Amino acid sequence: MRPESFNAFHEAIRFGAGHCPPDLFDGSVPAIVRGLKVHANNIAHARHVALEETYPRLLRAMDPGAFHEAAEQFLDQPHVVSLSLDALGEGFERYLEEASFRDLARAEWRWLEAFHAAEAEALTLADLASLQPDALLAARLRLHPATRWLVLEEPEAFDWDWQIAGDGEVLLLSRPDAEVLLRRVDAEAASILSALSRSRPVVRLLGADLPALITLIDAGTIVLESVRED
């Protein structure tokens, strides 16, 4: 299908047969309308299923009727209509009334982002210990591509598939290897994460909270970007 024909087809699916050029389909207008309705229903169903598969924990936690009502509102938004199925779901939490459900939705979306992020070798404490002092101070660090975090609205109510280690109001997601890991961290750790959103020399982190930094390294959230070669 030519690009202009595809665009016209897309407009007809979204807004009805009145937006369909007369030469796009063969047959009578009623037949075209029936065909478009069937296709539109199939697309709508597929988008609902995609949202359910994006948020399986949320779907289990919520009343199904409330989930689908929020899904209907979300999927009807103009900026959402044009998204492909694999990009569907970001921002869904804004259509949820309860804070605990918003936390869960944001966590599930960040889990997907972490899972699909680029590969990288996570920094370890052994890596740092192997560096000479001058090289260590000159080394640059940045976040692992899979690192994600969010501040929970209701930390005490947050629930996942398994017990999450750590304390604090910040949920940290990392993927140093194949598995996405979750743990709770505090505001000091979140401050370090924010600082490492851009490449930073180790010397700029000398004032950081050391236990928090060690926690982040152990979680596989940081990569060694460069080391000065002598």
Positions of PLM-derived features:
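Low-complexity, glycine/alanine/valine/leucine- and proline-rich hydrophobic stretches
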Residues: 140-198
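Long, charge-rich, low-complexity alpha-helical segments
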Residues: 1-132, 178, 183-230
